[in-house]
Design a protein with these regions (language model features):
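Long, compositionally biased, intrinsically disordered regions
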Residues: 23-355
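N-terminal single-pass transmembrane signal-anchor helix
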Residues: 1-26
Length: 355
């Protein structure tokens, strides 16, 4: 994609959302058309089905907020929203197979009530953030780490404002926001007295569309401690602005849990806890940004960080059309959607049997 095209893409994204909203039909108008025979304009039928998934809240309308609720009709729109293509943060999060409260594709398929249709949903930030550790400068009292941070769409650089957070044991460094033309180098300094491993979080906001915010993180060794894979010590679950941290190992002690957005960061309040888990209340932040949540703790003498994003994206769920492509017609439809006022890219694949 040429750079000029990418510029136009982001500059016009909000306008496209408004156009899509104006074109949106109600569920009463959409659903009868979706039951037409396959032979009657199959591409248009598939398009209407893809819209239906994003424009309707499903039944019960608040099924995303309870881990005991399973939708009887499927849709992921936010209940009561005046905007079209405005998705519910908890319904989206429960589509992620890594979420402890995830619903299965079999449950989604059954709730859609269209046995001749398979579907797949992908939701991701509007552009990518890549983090690479490029240099380490070890001193007597501290170590400086240099990172290369790239922001791009299909390999084309995306100018963005960046906010970086560095986390280690009882240590938080918040860098002043900076602007990148697609690639920039950032230094973070961690004292030698602080135990590792460490973590850097980068949130990137497009200069063309302030509601388009992407993110990434990078765990790295500090001192002699190397990072373990995410999920080694805690299983983090998100639902209804509550974080549940379930212990994956014995002798786990939680130190601090923090939430980070582009404009804000906050230490979360623990609401309940026992010897197997702890729960935290997640604030409703004012800015258009995903929330990155980091829990720190120790396992005996080992310090660790665990992290999760709210909404829990990027995600892909549904039918595996890579293995079904010789058996099904498949159409893909791309939409700009909002989740808690931030803009994301959503691709819906719809497939049916060949004629």
């Amino acid at each position: 994609m040429p750079a000029a095209s990418v510029d136009t893409f982001f500059a016009c994204s909000l306008m496209v959302l408004l156009v899509l909203s104006a074109m949106a039909s109600t569920s009463k108008l959409l659903y009868p058309y979706m039951n037409y025979a396959v032979g009657k304009n199959v591409v248009e039928r598939y398009k209407q089905i893809s819209r239906y998934l994003l424009l309707n809240a499903g039944t019960p309308s608040d099924w995303g907020k309870s881990n005991r609720a399973t939708p009887t009709t499927f849709g992921i729109a936010k209940t009561g929203s005046d905007e079209s293509y405005d998705l519910d943060v908890d319904k989206v999060t429960r589509l992620n197979g890594e979420n402890v409260y995830a619903i299965s594709y079999a449950q989604m398929f059954s709730a859609l009530k269209m046995p001749d249709i398979s579907f797949r949903i992908e939701i991701k930030p509007m552009f990518e953030v890549t983090i690479n550790l490029t240099a380490t400068y070890a001193g007597t009292n501290e170590t400086i780490y240099q990172f290369e941070i790239s922001t791009a769409k299909h390999g084309v650089p995306i100018p963005a404002d960046l906010k970086c957070y560095s986390i280690a044991e009882e240590y938080l460094e918040t860098a002043n926001p900076l602007t990148s033309n697609g690639r920039v180098y950032v230094n973070t300094t961690i004292p030698s007295t602080v135990r590792g491993p460490a973590l850097i979080i980068v949130l990137a906001r497009s200069v063309y569309q302030r509601k388009a915010v992407s993110f990434n993180s990078y765990s790295f060794a500090h001192g002699s401690a190397k990072p373990e894979p995410n999920g080694t010590f805690l299983r983090l679950g998100l639902l209804n602005h509550t974080l549940t941290a379930s212990f994956a190992q014995s002798n786990v002690t939680l130190l601090k849990t923090c939430a980070f957005t582009f404009d804000h960061n906050s230490t979360l309040s623990r609401t309940t806890s026992d010897n197997q888990s702890a729960r935290y209340s997640i604030p409703h932040f004012a800015d258009s940004s995903p929330i990155i949540i980091v829990s720190t703790g120790t396992n005996s003498t080992t310090f660790f960080t665990e992290q999760i994003a709210y909404p829990q994206i990027p995600l892909q769920t549904g039918a595996d059309f890579a293995t079904l492509k010789t058996h099904a017609k498949v159409s893909a439809y791309t939409y700009f959607v909002t989740i808690d006022s931030a803009i994301y890219e959503c691709i819906v694949w719809i497939g049916g049997l060949k004629d």
